[in-house]
Amino acid sequence: PLASLCTIGGPSRADLVAISNDETGISEDPDIRSSVAKKIVERAEDYGITRADIIVDPLVMPIGAINTAGRQVMHIVKRLREELQVNTTCGASNVSFGLPNRHGLNAAFLAMTIGAGLTSAITNPLHPEMMLAVLGAKIMMGHDLNCRRWVQKYREPQAANGAAREGRRSGRRRRAVP
């Protein structure tokens, strides 16, 4: 089955999204899931797919059913980024399945997995808690130079508008601080 997927598309092939389970199912052991991902990556490379074109989903399990599910995913994501140098994704809301205040748990999980090296997520990007988690994680990881996106998103509109009016009245322009 993997061979047929790796040959689809010819020279303009699409990225390969791989899930880290095999014919035995989803293991609770992060080492086994990492090993499965490694096999998939190596096999895909045999077909000419570069690691930059491979996205691995470590498979997020519900934390309410498996209390180590969050820690397992973060461990796997870190290994995938450091050892295999592949991009990662996950269904972020799977972690909170069956629990109250899912958005809060999902946001905490997403920020922590970004810290572990997650490069993309299947989630609701319009939910305020998720947006806050992603923007905050980008700052903490050094991906938001001078916190510009954060400030732009969360600056009080009245303060920003007042400062702009004052600058126009006095003829001053805002200058970037080196």
Annotated model-derived regions:
Residues 163-178:
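Terminal or standalone catalytic/regulatory effector modules within metabolic enzymes
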